[in-house]
Amino acid sequence: MFFRNLTFFRFPTTTDFSEVDTLLPHALLKPVGALEMNSRGFISPFGREEKELLSHRIAEHLWLTVGGEDKILPAAVVNDLLERKLEEIEEKEGRRPGGRERKRMKDDLLHELLPRAFVKSSRNDAFIDLQHGYVAVDTSSRKTGEYFMSDIRGLLGSFPAMPLNAEVAPRSILTGWIAGEPLPTGLSLGEECEMKDPVEGGAVVKCQHQELRCDEIDKHLDAGKQVTKLALIFEDNLSFVIGDDLIVRKLKFLDGALDQLEHADEDGRRAEFDARFALQSAEIRRLFLLLEEAFKLSKAD
């Protein structure tokens, strides 16, 4: 598997991860209970069937995975059944149950339906760079990333992770790049961007499959629009879209990176897993260090 998005968090490089493998067996995902809506806990990066190797580490990169089980119980189904019961009571007793009774009836319905509800499984993966003090979560959702930080915090007892903080406004950097300012070495423009009028409720322009250095784009910039999302290519190895929230979306590993796998000495599924982990973690580190310098990202130490 390859990461498709990157939500970064920083943490002090002095954070101690030495007890992770000892702590993980006590924080594993448990099957969601009959009367529970969801369950969450760590699973092995190698898959749920793996019970021994609960983390994976190569040099200063650590791979952790959180699994989830969620009951699928649409609110519309519950509300429809509740309405039927309310109508039955109204027809038999000539009254419409009030708020407190309605809540009790809804709770009873949930207890009745939950054991029969379908369960949806999920997983979230993260690479932790112990040397440079960042976590890269494979998600485009800040909220999902925060949940992962909470899971690590619960595992370690404390974990002072924080979202990326740029000392220079990301919009100004992205807007400058599309306006013709020099890009960092190795970066080039892709063919996608989003621009917004800075006033609240202002116009939004989205461009795809388009040359970004052109008169049309310049007109929008001259009108005061700022770049909020920008497609970039990092050497021949990565393509992605970065937003002014510093979340990396639509991440793709290109031939320049994937060619390294063809020359890897792979022998079996586990060896292939190791090769992909080593490749991804190394490329993501290179990208992070580039973004750190370009956006003047604050340290967590």
UniProtKB/Swiss-Prot annotation:
Q: What is its main location?
A: cytoplasm
Q: Which UniProt keywords apply?
A: Cytoplasm, DNA recombination
The entry lists its GO molecular-function terms as:
double-stranded DNA binding
Q: Where, subcellularly, is it found? A: Cytoplasm, Nucleoid
Coiled coil ranges: none
Q: GO terms for CC?
A: bacterial nucleoid; cytoplasm
Which residue spans traverse the membrane?
Answer: none
Entry's Gene Ontology BP terms: DNA recombination; regulation of DNA recombination
- One of its Pfam families is RdgC
Q: Which HAMAP family match?
A: RdgC (MF_00194)
Q: Which NCBIfam families match?
A: PRK00321.1-5, PRK00321.1-6
What role is this protein assigned?
Answer: May be involved in recombination.
Family named by the database record? Belongs to the RdgC family.
**What's the protein here called?**
Recombination-associated protein RdgC
**Gene of origin?**
rdgC
